[in-house]
From Swiss-Prot:
Its EC number is 6.1.1.15. It comes from Alteromonas mediterranea (strain DSM 17117 / CIP 110805 / LMG 28347 / Deep ecotype). One of its GO terms (biological process) is prolyl-tRNA aminoacylation. One of its GO terms (cellular component) is cytosol. InterPro entries: aa-tRNA-synt_IIb, aa-tRNA-synth_II, aa-tRNA-synth_II/BPL/LPL, Anticodon-bd, Anticodon-bd_dom_sf, Pro-tRNA-ligase_IIa, Pro-tRNA-synth_IIa_bac-type, Pro-tRNA-Synthase_IIa_type1. HAMAP family: Pro_tRNA_synth_type1 (MF_01569). It is found in: Cytoplasm. The keyword Iron-sulfur does not apply. Keywords: Aminoacyl-tRNA synthetase, ATP-binding, Cytoplasm, Ligase, Nucleotide-binding, Protein biosynthesis. Homodimer. This is Proline--tRNA ligase. Its main location: cytoplasm. It catalyses: tRNA(Pro) + L-proline + ATP = L-prolyl-tRNA(Pro) + AMP + diphosphate.
């Protein structure tokens, strides 16, 4: 491809509204242009990358036995009513009416459509298992689209859905999809982790997320130093330390002051690692004699080590805790506890209490004394406390699998797989005749990859101050051909044209910069776009029948004989 015949569309300045580096570089490198909030046009360079990502996804899905289909973006509302999600789904679901005032949605996911399809097309166990996928545009009406295509309203996604008679068969396909996802991200040259995850609103039991590691990632990933264990911090089990042995020292009450809990601890020379804090949360509703949900004014106390953070997902799994988790305000906590929560005695609370295992392992710890401005030190737990895991793990914690310690890095979620079970198939009566001739509801799996999100995530992981540093498999072009002052030198033009034709004949993707531009502009643009390899043709090197090769990722430079350049590039 010649730049003179291409929409290069690079920009020198960083757009003011672009917050993250991937958004900035995608705009500056001429990959995308904003049409409206959360909506982007893909320009040629961006589309080339997007298509390469999608092709790798397709190849690995096909290899794993999945079959490609294409479903409508617009979906009838009656399918969503049938599944129960018409009422459950939030304002992210864009609802529209046609000219006949019939309700439709712009699909954010396709569980309903695929379940209806299989319900109508599959009637016998002999047609199973079946795994169908598509690569298609989705729409979610994000309340605050941001970070460019990272969190846009319209995006490209690969979503696959598998159908099975037995859970054991689902587990086999789930493992195939897990392996396929690992192959996909490995082929793209990305540093990623597959982590144990929460199934969220989609539903189901078993779930893994796939994260591209990047400092700008929204999610915290915990993984073992010595094994393959990895989990979202929200899901990682916290291994409690061995229980400390009390010294036998008497409990001592001290005066304390401070605007926050850390200041209070500091005022009595207490360490947060050997102190506990009380978090008051709303209790769950109760059922009346008719089985109806009755809102009750109950509260539950959660006790953690003072330096640890409460994990909402873990806390919501405690019987008696309201879902979603609702923390009491400072004034509410003060009214319920009879004292500021900073000075509440964690060993003697007026409401049901659950103690995190790491806090329960403490001895001679510091807690409130149950009176304003007072704390107790050298406190130990009474018998019979309720011990739970309700904290986020931290770096240095023991790995839950017993191998090594945990490290924590930021990650960008680019894939998610679920064992859905029968959530949708039961709601939509999707089943087949089993071998015994009885109707059997199918069990399902769901497997998503954010195709367009991968493009942004790859940039977040692969860039420098000059621009993007694409991994070879997803780069828009393999090599940039940069002839310096070609329009002033016949022999440079001749050498460049000849090499370009040779490389194209080999099927190599080349961006031939044949613009009438200064060499500095050409170099800057090629580095900004992030093409992995470049060949520079200049007068001085051409005197020796040589050209210069540069590797964008490593910065390596070397001189090549012009006659050997074609073979060198082909071997990259």
């Amino acid at each position: 491809m010649r730049t003179s015949q291409y929409l290069l569309a690079t920009q020198k300045e960083t757009p003011a509204d672009a917050e993250v580096i991937s958004h900035q570089l995608m705009l500056r490198a001429g990959m995308i242009r904003k049409l409206a909030s959360g909506l982007y046009t893909w320009l040629p360079s961006g589309l080339r990358v997007l298509n390469k990502v999608a092709n790798i996804v397709r190849e690995e899905m096909n290899k794993a036995g999945a079959i490609e289909v294409l479903m409508p973006v617009v979906q009838p509302a009656d399918l969503w009513e049938e599944s129960g999600r018409w009422e459950e789904y939030g304002p992210e679901l864009l609802r529209v009416k046609d000219r006949h005032q019939r309700d439709f949605v712009l699909g954010p996911t396709h569980e309903e459509v695929i379940t209806a399809l299989v319900r109508n097309e599959i009637s016998s166990y002999k047609q199973l298992p079946l795994n169908l996928y598509q690569v298609q545009t989705k729409f979610r009406d994000e309340v605050r689209p941001r970070f460019g295509i990272m969190r846009g309203r319209e995006f490209t996604m690969k979503d696959a859905y598998s159908f099975h008679l037995e859970d054991s068969c689902l587990e086999e396909t789930y493992q195939k999809m897990y392996d396929a996802y690992c192959a996909i991200f490995s082929r793209m040259g990305l540093d990623f982790r597959a982590v144990i995850a929460d199934s969220g609103s989609i539903g189901g039991n078993h779930s893994h997320e796939f994260h591209v590691l990047a400092e700008s990632g929204e999610d915290a990933i915990a993984f073992s130093s010595d094994s393959d264990y990895a989990a979202n911090v929200e899901m990682a089990a916290a291994v409690a330390p061995e229980k400390a042995v009390p010294s036998g020292a008497d409990v001592e009450t001290k005066d304390a002051k401070g605007k926050d809990f850390n200041a209070i601890l500091k005022s009595v020379d207490a360490n947060a690692t050997n102190a506990v804090k009380v978090v008051l949360v709303k209790g769950a509703n109760e059922l009346n004699d008719k089985g109806e949900d009755v809102v009750c004014d109950k509260w539950v106390a959660l006790v953690l080590r003072a330096d640890h953070e409460l994990n909402d997902i873990k806390a919501e799994k405690i019987d008696g805790v309201a879902i979603p988790l609702v923390e009491a305000s400072f004034e509410q906590a003060k009214d319920v506890l009879g004292v500021s929560p900073f000075f509440a005695d964690a060993t003697n609370l007026p409401v049901p209490a659950y103690v995190d295992a790491s806090a329960a392992a403490l001895a001679d710890f510091t807690t409130g004394a149950g009176a304003g401005g007072k704390v107790n030190v050298n406190v130990n737990w009474p018998d019979g406390i309720n011990t739970v895991d309700i904290r986020n793990v931290v770096a240095g914690d023991a790995s839950p699998d017993g191998q090594g310690t945990l490290d924590i890095k930021r990650g960008i979620e680019v894939g998610h797989i679920f064992q859905l079970g029968r959530k949708y198939s039961e709601a939509m009566n999707c089943g087949v005749l089993s071998e015994t001739g009885k109707h059997q509801t199918l069990t399902m799996g769901c497997y998503g990859i954010g195709v367009s999100r991968i493009v942004a995530a790859a940039i977040e992981q692969n860039h420098d101050k000059f621009g993007i540093k694409w991994p070879d498999p997803i780069a828009p072009f393999k090599i940039a051909l940069i002839p310096m002052n070609m329009h002033k030198s016949h022999r440079i033009k001749e050498a460049a044209e000849a090499l370009y034709e040779e490389l194209v004949a080999l099927g190599i993707e080349v961006l031939f910069d044949d613009r009438k531009e200064r060499p500095g502009v050409m170099f800057n643009d090629m580095e900004l776009i992030g093409i992995p390899h470049s060949i520079v043709i200049g007068e001085r090197n051409l005197d020796n029948q040589q050209v210069e090769y540069k590797n964008r990722r490593t910065g390596e430079k070397q001189l090549l004989d012009l006659s050997a350049a074609k073979e060198f590039v082909a071997a990259l």
